[in-house]
Amino acid sequence: MSSSSSSSAVFPLDHLAAPSPTEQLCYVHCNCCDTILAVGVPCSSLFKTVTVRCGHCANLLSVNLRGLLLPAPAPAPANQLHFGPSLLSPTSPHGLLDEVAFQTPSLLMEQAASASLSSITGRSSSSCASNAPAMQMPPAKPVQQEPELPKNAPASANRPPEKRQRVPSAYNRFIKDEIQRIKAGNPDISHREAFSAAAKNWAHFPHIHFGLMPDQGFKKTFKPQDGSEDILLKDSLYAAAAAAAAAAANMGVTPF
């Protein structure tokens, strides 16, 4: 029990005949050809679901008239348009024209496009968020290990070369002992004067260089620069000099 009629997206309402008192005029939107259909529904079927055939594209539409008459809290299907009570009344054609101008198909298409764009944006943002940790973490670089030294390596390998200690010569030993002997006999003498006197004693005793024995020694006087009394050389001097000469001979020192 349904009737259908087709019209263009914008149609004059003057050509529409006023419905009979036993029918209710309803307007249904065809989502296939984007056409608004004016349907006359009997009053006995206002709260039923009727089938409407589009006169423009012959598409069958299932229309719930209860949703058209009473606004429901849930959103209506895409193929139905909600009109106020003034639109359902056949005596207010101008109000219907105003509502149709606002509820154009282009507005519906924009709403659908915005919904699809928001869903695509949400999916892309979630995929970017899931890929963000992988992009932020750079690949780990291999750690270069330094070659380990063997544990049993000798410690002397890293030790700097030691300086070889030279054995003091017979001359150095004689000068050292002679300076100590001169300072013991004359404590007031300076180190420079004692060294000069020790060097003169070494030069004035050629028998020391030849390694003569202490029993062949002789006495010699020494006159210091400060005019002090002559110091008599003792037998201990010859013994020390002889020992120094013997050590020098053992080291291969040639006599003068």
UniProtKB/Swiss-Prot annotation:
A GO molecular-function term, please?
A: zinc ion binding
Known role? Seems to be associated with phloem cell differentiation.
Q: Name one GO cellular component term.
A: nucleus
**Pfam families for the chain:** YABBY (PF04690), YABBY_N (PF24868)
Annotated GO biological process: abaxial cell fate specification; cell fate commitment; fruit development; polarity specification of adaxial/abaxial axis; regulation of leaf development; regulation of shoot apical meristem development
Could you list this entry's UniProt keywords, alphabetically sorted: Differentiation, Metal-binding, Nucleus, Zinc, Zinc-finger
This one is known as Protein YABBY 4
Q: Which domain of life is it from?
A: Eukaryota
Location(s), subcellular: Nucleus
